[in-house]
Amino acid sequence: MTTSKNPVVLVHGLYDTVTVFDTISTDLAQSGWSVHSLNLIPNYGSAKLEILALQLAEYITHTFPDDQPIDIIGFSMGGLITRYYLQRLEGIKKVQRYINISAPNRGTTIAYSLPLPGIVQMRPDSDFIKDLNQDCQHRLNQIKCTFIWTPYDLMIVPASSTLLGIGREIQIPVILHAWMVKDQRVLKAIKEALLEPIM
């Protein structure tokens, strides 16, 4: 059993860049973690999520040695991108701890507002969501998973769409979706999840 601090990769969401993680990055770095993140391009929904997941996979391959385990945090759309990496690009073999924050894991009705390919994939009835969810229990239960959500989320509708019945599910009553990567209660939950022992 080990509680070593793995490098942490942060994956942002729609319209975001790495700067959305400034608070988390600073907090984790000050607590002894090696923190990494990348800008997904394009970030506004014009590319399918598989394309962005390939960017993530390439970044990880070029950043870490093959034998270096890592932990991943995916926020919002980044939660789906990280899940595709884990479930479809063999990321499950690389990642030991996974934190999914306010992601549309079962889709969000907000995604019906725009017809862009990456946004369409976030609809509750999309083939992308259906595909990821048909084997998520089997795949994600192989690693330590934590799902953090707020019932007040107006971007993930319904807010409970983040939950998959896997791993630890933590409800934190943060008022705004964007504050989920800034709230001190969320930061505390993240650090606790990153310190969970690996068998």
Where are these regions (language model features)?
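Serine-dependent carboxylesterase/thioesterase catalytic core
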Residues: 8-14, 19, 28-38, 46-140, ...
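Short amphipathic alpha-helix
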Residues: 23-24
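Proline/glycine-enriched tight loop/beta-turn segments at coil->beta junctions
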Residues: 2-7
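C-terminal catalytic-base region of ester-bond hydrolases, centering on the histidine
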Residues: 141-199
